[in-house]
């Protein structure tokens, strides 16, 4: 069969060696989606770089919402090439509702349309040593004389860790955990955690709390994979804070972007998916608790994906207030 996928450029990381795949199964890399063209293109470039490291199977980009191609189009591309098994990876940082609920719903639709296809659903990135080390290395760069000409000590510096925000408290808790793990032992005065939408405290409140420590420097860490409207919003607010409080050195790191550490992590997740070794802790899942409290069993049994605990959700009478993806997305822009 002919393998078609993202046109792969020359790899930016030819020295990066990935472990071999057990199977030559096509891979859907599923991004969140953004209306921002820069963010969309960066995700496509990320997928292309991953494909460039291994041409043994097609790697196909698609998006959950807000832009094209969507998940159904990605699945159709695999079907058109005659594949009967598909690995699907959510390129998401945390296991919020998109990962637990929305992507799985889309894969259910695909399974109904293509019952001959066997789907294998993988795991989000989560909290990993590779990502922690990446952020530590980026912070180390800000200690250089070029980035820190005033020589401000870490003890006089507050980290401001900015997450996207989620309706799922499990994911929000992971943001706090990541911030804490990054800060402990770093030598910085403290870390404040905030969100750009959905959740509280918001970024402006995060700045206010950071100033209470009377720091000489605040470093903003936007915990995002790729550029997009929300990252640009973080940068805009940071510029406003810099102009309002010129006595404080306010710096901001960029989003993570295309990094070899992330490409290696994708390979880990792809191998997990192929071997059926994906595992998640569902004990604190918001959706499980909602069903349990209303007398429903939490099925955890979407047949289309195989990952350790068979994470899925039986759709009973529980009312999902974010059932429309557009309504969920728009809430992130609403004022408290």
Swiss-Prot record:
Described purpose of this protein according to its UniProt entry: Chelates cobalt to the cobalamin precursor as part of the anaerobic pathway to cobalamin biosynthesis.
Gene3D superfamilies, alphabetized: 3.40.50.1400
Protein's recorded name: Sirohydrochlorin cobaltochelatase
Record organism: Synechocystis sp. (strain ATCC 27184 / PCC 6803 / Kazusa)
Residues annotated for [4Fe-4S] cluster binding in this entry: 282, 285
GO biological process: cobalamin biosynthetic process
Binding locations of Co(2+): 32, 98
One MF annotation (Gene Ontology) recorded for this entry: metal ion binding
CDD domains xref list: CbiX_SirB_C, CbiX_SirB_N
Complex and partners: Homodimer.
Gene name linked to the record: cbiX
């Amino acid at each position: 069969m002919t393998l078609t996928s993202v046109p792969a450029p020359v790899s930016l990381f030819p020295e990066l060696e990935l472990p071999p795949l057990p199977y030559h199964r096509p891979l859907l890399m599923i991004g969140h989606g953004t209306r921002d063209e820069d963010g969309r293109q960066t995700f496509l470039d990320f997928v292309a770089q991953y494909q460039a490291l291994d041409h043994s199977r097609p790697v196909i980009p698609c998006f959950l919402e807000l832009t094209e191609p969507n998940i159904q189009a990605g699945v159709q591309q695999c079907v058109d090439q005659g594949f009967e098994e598909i690995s699907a990876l959510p390129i998401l940082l945390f296991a919020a509702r998109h990962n637990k609920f929305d992507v799985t719903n889309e894969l259910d639709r695909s399974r109904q349309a293509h019952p001959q296809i066997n789907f294998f659903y993988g795991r989000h990135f989560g909290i990993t040593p590779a990502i922690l080390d990446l952020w530590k290395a980026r912070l180390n760069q800000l200690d250089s004389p070029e980035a820190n000409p005033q020589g401000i000590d870490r003890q006089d510096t507050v980290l401001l860790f900015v997450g996207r925000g989620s309706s799922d408290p499990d994911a929000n808790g992971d943001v706090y955990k990541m911030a804490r793990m990054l800060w402990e032992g770093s030598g910085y005065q403290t870390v404040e955690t905030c969100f750009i939408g959905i959740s509280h405290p918001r970024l402006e409140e995060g700045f206010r709390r950071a100033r209470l420590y009377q720091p000489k420097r605040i470093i903003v860490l936007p915990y995002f994979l790729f550029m997009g409207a929300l990252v640009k919003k973080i940068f805009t607010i940071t510029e406003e804070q810099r102009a309002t409080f010129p006595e404080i050195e306010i710096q901001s790191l960029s989003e993570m972007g295309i990094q070899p550490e992330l490409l290696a992590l994708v390979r880990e997740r792809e191998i997990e998916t192929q071997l059926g070794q994906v595992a998640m802790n569902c004990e604190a899942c918001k959706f499980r608790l909602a069903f349990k409290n209303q007398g429903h069993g939490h099925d955890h049994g979407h047949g289309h994906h195989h990952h350790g605990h068979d994470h899925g959700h039986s759709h009973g009478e529980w009312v999902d207030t974010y059932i429309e993806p557009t309504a969920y997305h728009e809430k992130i822009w609403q004022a408290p």
